[in-house]
């Protein structure tokens, strides 16, 4: 016998002792053993442990009984399945015992065992088998009405089982339903309540037929509002409807037209508890079935408005109320103390249910926001005076919900011609602000902490939606903030909330609004800085930092004299900084606050400046505070006050140098930023020995291992080169070696390249230059020029562009050398002995040098570039076209007419010449292009009918770039082309519009927005190519600048959805030898339409009717391979973004996924077909996994059946598990770049 088994055996022996203390201690020790993962029981030990624990459930000592029942939980996972079933059988038998205590223990035991059973999703069948075993016994226990205690315990356990394992118990659902329905008529309220809960869980998991039976039963049992019926019976049925609505509301949609009018009638009966249940049912219906509730919204809104003010036992005299608001705060507090209170008054529950229902109404119907602002908002504001704390919190919550839905979407763009709906909503909200202030003015000083917290939350949300709207009411807000900051009799939470609100306010309101109130506001903030509770102090330091940053900004003249305040702020902050026993958060906030104080007001610190800097230096030496200290030092160094930092530089620089060796990325990044700021601000004041110490650490940081670190290192090198070039002598060689190696990386980010260009220019810009121009050019070009043979360019294409940019940067820094460089490049480009790589680099360098130093030898250059367009190397041809355009942009009078003439004269080279024109149009200044607009416009539109799609695409891009030259003149001309042009011309014009859209704000946006509706009419064009181009343009707008199209979606979406449908007239059969091949000409258009739908999910979710949207997603799940892949990804996103509508139709959505996952590949399929099918399965299973993250989805019988099918199929199980691991290990890769 092992040591563990022997120990268990000795415990079991003590558990049978006659001494209850022995039994208790032994059972406690067994509990500890069972909780260990390492414990292993043999079969004999299992049997003995189970038998002994079950016997102890009947122990005379209640303490021993309670401990024994707790042991059952960990025991379940340590014994075999038949032992668990033995435990369950015994507990079920004990449930029917005559002894009340034993029945109670058995009930607790069953709940404990059920809670510890492994979920069905893990593949274990234990939970299902155990539940099936006890369901029948629970049913009979519920049906026997002799003992109510047994009934209640059985109903509790049944509810727990159904909530966890509803669907797998499908065979029992009918018997459970028929057992539970009669209990709705039980004379015992507790039985009825537990039955309502159980039926709610059953409704979520049962079959459609049983659900219909349940719904019909509830509807049929509800009497007419005037028919005689027991109020208790009606309340129970309405509560049951509410429970079903909360648990399975997505299945109630089809029954709502019958249910809602009846519930409305009952809501008007004089029974507050019934009214509460009716309103709770409406809330569930609105949240789960917003589409089906649409016809009933006006009536529900009316009921909410009526019952939100339902307070029959209290007289709210509005005239008195207004008069009271003018009284002083002492009278206000007296009135607050005399609040009405009546324990028998239930009307507050009705008001709370109405407020919650109103919040559900707002969140489920954002499309009705204008109506809500007219009807709900004033009513909510009037009810801010609510006397019941819980109700008031829900009223605040409903108004906050309205604010959140009014918040403009990201990237919102107001139209110039007419305000959008978003703008009108904001205007309506702006008109409400004075009313909100008036309603909450007294409440900001309410005795009740929760009320004040609600006010702060509401104002924070309001300031976020309408920045600047609270400025004229600052006196009221400051008064309320100060009141809470000085409230030491309540929890410190209210001070933290007040501070957080003040910090947010400083970020949204203009600084001038705070100036008159600073003498009042600053003392309580200073007191909070010194607060002994670390969270209050940390929050206060953050506020102080924001005060300094906002009231004395560095980019504008000071409008407020800091002299009266700077001493007090400095003293309070330094006191916190000097303390050594502080919480880490307070230390970091104090350091940051000092950084802002010195950076913004250092010139007013006088003699306190040097001690403050020394304190910062001291924190720099401390490992715990060094990162915030580095950031604070950066703030100080970057300050335009140009403070004298000499007292700390000699010691600080070596410390900073040591940080560059630390294996802490955040510290290295912050240190490099600090060093660069110091070098820029202090320049020659930096001690050269200390600078050299820092520089020796830099070569190791210029590496592609971390591009961001490399960029900051190069930026610092540039600054040092400009301020102390002599310090660079020793490290310039190693640094250049690393930098040139970095330039050979094909993944070089634009920021690193720009930093490198700046550094190279700094090297040759010093007098004398740190490194000679010719030497740097040789170093840059050596890897290309020294390449042996001509096996192609050798290096990655991107590397050539990087090297060319650096050559151009050097030429710009040394204008006297540029002409010679250009001549050498032309010679290299035309030399027959030059390799492909040399020619590519020469042309790309000429393109860049031409931009900064002129085009060099004109006639010869044109000839060389034209000849290169006929090169056998594709890389050389592309580089020459690029160079022709870029060089031409620098000398339009000479090059552009020449380029246009060549396009006319050389149709065979048209594609390359159009690429050159595109580069010229993109690189030239718009004003310089104006004289050539008409010629270029005419030439481009002559080529819109090219049969080559690639050519038409380049033409479209050229047209787009040309429009930027004079948008008001050229953009309207698109109308004529769209109306009169041929199909190819129309598609080219629409494609050109796509190139007018960027993800950054642009001056053309308002003008473009006014034309979008006309462009989108092309979705009705008879030509497929035009419709596809329109969808591509629309997708680009939705992805990059959704504000352009948001307000047009009502008109666009029906046309978009039309394009997702399969058109049989576009499907044809093509004979290929003995085989027939099906071609779907509409596939590309459908695919473009589904890509638009995906983009809409990311940026315009609030404008979509999700039920209609899902109809088309459902169709896409059965479409072509490419479209199914798109819709699987969409469905995975929808499962997260819109769980409620997805849940409503999950039974229909899961079938196409099941069909894909279980599809068999045809015999003899080629490898490509096998791979496509495998990827399709994987994508479908990802969608399944995303759906299953919603616990409500798992309750669906169809989903439960498919889950069981996955678990029973080893191949599907492996696939599902691998997807779950991928999801757990990192973010999903199922994102699409559709721009």
From Swiss-Prot:
The gene is Cand2. The modification N-acetylserine is found at residue 2. Belongs to the CAND family. InterPro entries: ARM-like, ARM-type_fold, CAND1/CAND2, HEAT, TATA-bd_TIP120. Residues 317-345 have a biased composition (Acidic residues). This is Cullin-associated NEDD8-dissociated protein 2. It comes from the Eukaryota. Binds TBP, CNOT3 and UBE3C. Its main location: nucleus. It is found in: Nucleus.
């Amino acid at each position: 016998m092992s040591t563990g088994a022997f120990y268990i055996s000795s415990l079991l022996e003590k558990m049978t002792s006659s001494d209850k203390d022995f039994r208790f201690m032994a059972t406690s020790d067994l509990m500890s053993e069972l909780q260990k993962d390492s414990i292993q029981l043999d079969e004999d030990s299992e049997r003995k442990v189970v038998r002994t624990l079950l016997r102890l459930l009947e122990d005379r000592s209640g303490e021993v009984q309670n401990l024994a029942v707790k042991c059952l939980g960990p025991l379940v996972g340590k014994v075999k399945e038949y032992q668990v079933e033995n435990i369950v059988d015994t507990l079920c038998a004990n449930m029917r015992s005559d002894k009340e205590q034993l029945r109670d223990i058995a009930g607790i035991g069953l709940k404990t065992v059920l809670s510890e059973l492994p979920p069905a999703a893990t593949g274990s069948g234990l939970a299902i088998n155990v539940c099936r075993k006890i369901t029948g016994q629970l049913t009979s226990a519920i049906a026997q009405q002799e003992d109510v205690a047994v009934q209640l315990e059985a109903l509790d356990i049944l509810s727990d089982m159904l909530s966890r394992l509803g669907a797998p118990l499908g065979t029992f659902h009918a018997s459970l339903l028929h057992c539970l329905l009669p209990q709705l008529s039980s004379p015992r309220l507790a039985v009825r309540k537990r039955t309502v809960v159980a039926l709610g869980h059953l409704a979520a998991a049962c079959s459609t037929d049983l659900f219909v039976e349940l719904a019909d039963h509830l509807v049929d049992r509800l009497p007419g509002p005037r028919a005689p019926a027991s109020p208790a019976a009606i309340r129970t049925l309405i509560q049951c409807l509410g429970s079903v609505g909360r648990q399975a509301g997505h299945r109630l949609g089809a029954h709502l037209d019958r249910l809602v009018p009846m519930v409305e009638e009952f809501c008007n009966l004089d029974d507050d508890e019934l009214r509460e249940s009716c309103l709770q049912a409406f809330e569930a219906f609105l949240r789960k079935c917003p589409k089906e509730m649409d016809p009933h919204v006006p009536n529900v809104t009316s009921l909410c408005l009526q019952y939100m003010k339902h307070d029959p036992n209290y007289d709210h005299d509005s005239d008195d109320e207004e008069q009271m608001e003018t009284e002083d705060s002492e009278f206000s507090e007296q009135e607050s103390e005399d609040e009405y209170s009546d324990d028998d008054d239930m009307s507050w529950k009705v008001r709370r249910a109405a407020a919650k229902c109103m919040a559900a109404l707002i969140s489920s119907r954002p499309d009705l926001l204008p109506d809500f602002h007219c009807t709900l908002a004033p009513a909510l504001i009037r009810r801010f005076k609510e006397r019941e704390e819980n109700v008031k919190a829900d009223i605040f919550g409903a108004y906050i919900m309205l604010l959140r839905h009014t918040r403009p979407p990201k990237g919102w763009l107001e139209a110039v011609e007419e305000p959008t709906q978003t703008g009108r909503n904001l205007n309506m909200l702006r008109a409400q602000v004075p009313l909100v202030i008036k309603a909450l003015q007294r409440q900001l000083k309410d005795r009740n902490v929760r009320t004040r917290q609600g006010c702060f939350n509401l104002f924070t949300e309001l300031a976020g939606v309408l920045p600047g709207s609270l400025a004229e009411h600052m006196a009221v807000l400051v008064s309320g903030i100060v009141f809470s900051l000085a409230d030491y009799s309540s929890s410190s939470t209210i001070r933290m909330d007040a501070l957080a609100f003040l910090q947010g306010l400083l970020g949204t309101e203009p600084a001038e609004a705070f100036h008159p109130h600073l003498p009042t506001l600053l003392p309580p903030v200073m007191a909070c800085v010194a607060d002994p509770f670390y969270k209050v102090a940390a929050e206060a330091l953050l506020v102080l930092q924001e005060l300094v940053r906002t009231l004395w900004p560095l980019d504008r003249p000071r409008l407020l004299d800091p002299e009266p305040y700077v001493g007090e702020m400095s003293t309070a902050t330094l006191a916190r900084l000097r303390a050594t026993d502080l919480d880490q958060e307070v230390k970091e906030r104090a350091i940051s606050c000092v950084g802002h104080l010195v950076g913004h007001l250092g010139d007013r610190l006088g003699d306190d400046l040097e001690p403050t800097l020394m304190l910062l230096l001291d924190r720099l030496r401390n490992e715990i505070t060094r990162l915030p200290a580095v950031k604070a030092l950066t703030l100080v160094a970057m300050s335009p006050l140009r403070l004298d930092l000499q007292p700390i530089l000699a010691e600080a620089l070596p410390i900073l140098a040591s940080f560059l060796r630390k294996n802490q990325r955040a510290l290295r990044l912050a240190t490099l930023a600090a060093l660069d700021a110091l070098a820029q601000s202090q320049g020659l004041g930096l001690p050269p020995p200390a600078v050299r110490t820092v520089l020796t650490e830099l070569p190791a940081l210029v590496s592609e291992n971390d591009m961001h670190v490399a960029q900051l290192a190069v930026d610092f090198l540039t600054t040092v080169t400009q301020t102390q070039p002599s310090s660079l002598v020793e490290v310039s060689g190693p640094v250049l070696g690393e930098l040139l190696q970095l330039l050979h990386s094909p993944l070089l980010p634009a920021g690193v390249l720009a930093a490198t260009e700046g550094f190279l220019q700094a090297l040759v810009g010093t007098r004398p230059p740190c490194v000679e121009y010719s030497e740097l050019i040789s170093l840059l070009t050596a890897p290309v020029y020294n390449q042996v043979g001509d096996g192609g360019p050798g290096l990655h294409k991107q590397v050539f562009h990087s090297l060319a940019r650096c050559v151009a940067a050097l030429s710009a820094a040394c204008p006297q050398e540029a002409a010679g460089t250009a001549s050498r490049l032309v010679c290299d480009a035309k030399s027959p002995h030059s390799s492909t790589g040399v020619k590519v680099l020469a042309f790309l360098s000429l393109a860049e040098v031409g931009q900064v130093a002129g085009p060099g030898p004109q006639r010869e250059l044109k000839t060389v570039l034209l000849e290169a367009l006929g090169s056998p190397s594709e890389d050389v041809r592309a580089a020459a076209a690029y160079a022709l355009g870029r060089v031409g942009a620098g000398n339009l009078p000479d090059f552009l007419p020449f380029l246009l003439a060549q396009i006319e004269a050389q149709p065979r080279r048209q594609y390359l010449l159009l690429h050159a024109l595109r580069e010229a149009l993109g690189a030239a200044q718009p004003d310089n292009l104006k004289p050539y607009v008409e010629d270029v416009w005419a030439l481009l539109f002559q080529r819109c009918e090219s049969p080559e799609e690639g050519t038409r695409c380049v033409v479209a891009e050229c047209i787009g770039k040309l429009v930027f030259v004079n948008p008001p003149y050229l953009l309207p001309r698109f109308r004529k082309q769209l109306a009169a042009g041929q199909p190819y011309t129309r598609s080219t014009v629409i494609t050109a519009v796509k190139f007018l859209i960027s993800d950054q704000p642009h001056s053309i946006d308002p003008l473009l927005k006014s034309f979008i509706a006309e462009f989108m009419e092309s979705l009705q064009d008879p030509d497929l190519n035009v419709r596809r181009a329109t969808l591509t343009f629309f997708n680009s707008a939705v992805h990059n600048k959704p504000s352009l199209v948001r307000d047009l979606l009502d008109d666009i979406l029906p046309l978009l959805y039309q394009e997702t449908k399969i058109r049989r007239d576009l499907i044809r059969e093509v004979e290929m030898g003995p085989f027939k091949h099906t071609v779907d000409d509409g596939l590309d258009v459908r695919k473009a339409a589904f890509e638009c739908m995906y983009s809409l999910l990311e940026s315009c979710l609030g404008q979509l009717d999700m039920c209609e949207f899902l109809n088309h997603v459902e169709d896409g799940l059965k479409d072509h391979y490419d479209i199914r892949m798109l819709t699987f990804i969409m469905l995975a996103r929808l499962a997260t973004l819109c769980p409620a509508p997805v849940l409503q139709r999950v039974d229909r959505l899961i079938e196409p996924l099941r069909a894909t996952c279980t599809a068999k590949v045809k015999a003899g399929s080629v490898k490509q077909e096998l791979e496509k099918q495998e990827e399709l399965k994987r994508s479908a299973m990802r969608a399944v996994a995303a759906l299953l993250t919603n616990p409500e989805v798992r309750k669906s019988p169809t989903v439960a059946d498919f889950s069981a099918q996955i678990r029973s199929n080893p191949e599907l199980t492996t696939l599902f598990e691998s997807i779950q691991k991928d999801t757990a290990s990192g973010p999903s890769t199922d994102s699409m770049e559709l721009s």
